[in-house]
Amino acid sequence: MKPEDAEAVYHTASTALFESPEDQEVLRRRTPEDVENRKARYKHSLRHDPGGAWVAEDDGRVSGVAISLVRERVWVLSLLVVDADHRNTGLGKNLLQRALASADGCEGAMIASSQHPAAMRRYASAGFDLHPTLTAYGVVRREAIPSGLAVRDGEEQDLELAAEVDRAVRGAAHGPDLEHLLATSCRLLVAERPSGKGYAAEWNGSPAVLAATDPVVARDLLWACLERTPPGEKAEVNWITGRQNWSVPVAIGAGLSLSPAGPICTRGDLGPLAPYLPSGPFL
C-alpha cells in the first residue's frame, strides 16, 4: 500500500462494508471531516506499519485491502475488505495471510470482525477465538446520568497512565494510535481513585476506546462519555463482549438500545480484556 492509495482504500472499504440500505444511510450521514479522518487513519497505519498494509488491484482498481499493526507484543488487524466482485475467490484469505506475516514474534493478536459469515469463518480458520458482541445505540436519557462523576479531562502527561492501563488490560499500549485518535477527533477522559484507574477517548459522547483496571472506574468513564453527547444526538457504544457486563446497566440506564454485532476475535496471550471497550480499527 502507498499513501496515494488512501482515497481508493476508503472507496473500497465503504462499498464493501456498507451494503444494506441502513448502512448506506450511515455513509450519507458522514461529514467531510469524518471521511478525511478515515483516510488519515489509513495513512497513519501505513506510516507506522508499512509492512502490514497491502492492497490488491484488478485492472488498476483496488479490489481488496488488508491493514494490520503491531504494538509492543500484540498484533491487530485494522481493516480487511474485499469488494463484491472478488469475493469467494480466495483474495480475502490471501490478504489475511499477508497481514498475518507481520505478526511473527507477537504473543497475542486481535481482530474486530464484521458479522459477515465469510469473515468470521476466515478468522476462526486462522486460529482465532470469536467472542460475540453487542452494540448500544440511541439518544441518551440525560436525567439518568449520575452526578459527581470523578472523571476529568486528560492531558498529555496522562498518556503514560493510558499506556499503563492498556498493558494491564490488553497486553500492550496503543502508543501512536491513541495519540492519532486524540489529534484527529477524540477527547481524553481520565479517572483515578484508590480502587483503580482508567481512561477513555471520547468522540461526541461515544467511546472510541475505553480501558480501566476496575469496573466501577470503567462505569464512571462510560457515563462521562455519554454525558458529553450533544443534545438530541445519538451515542454509540461498540464491541460489548460478555466480559463487559459492567457496561450493560449503563447502556440500558442511559436509554440505549442493544443489538447484536460482529465478534471480537482473539488469539494467543493477551491481557484480561476487561474492563475494556476496544477501538474497532486499533482495538
Segments the model singles out, each with a brief description of its role:
Residues M1-G105:
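Active-site-proximal cofactor/substrate-binding loop regions of enzyme domains
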Residues M1-H11, L149-L161:
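A short beta-loop-alpha structural element at the N-terminal edge
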Residues P21, H44-R47, G51-A53, E57-D58, ...:
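Intrinsically disordered, low-complexity, positively biased terminal segments
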Residues R73, M110-A112, D129-R142, L258-D269:
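Conserved catalytic-core motifs of GNAT/GCN5-like acyltransferases
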Residues H116-L134:
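Internal alpha/beta loop-helix hairpins
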Residues A144-G148, P272-L273:
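Short, charged/polar, Gly/Pro-enriched secondary-structure boundary elements
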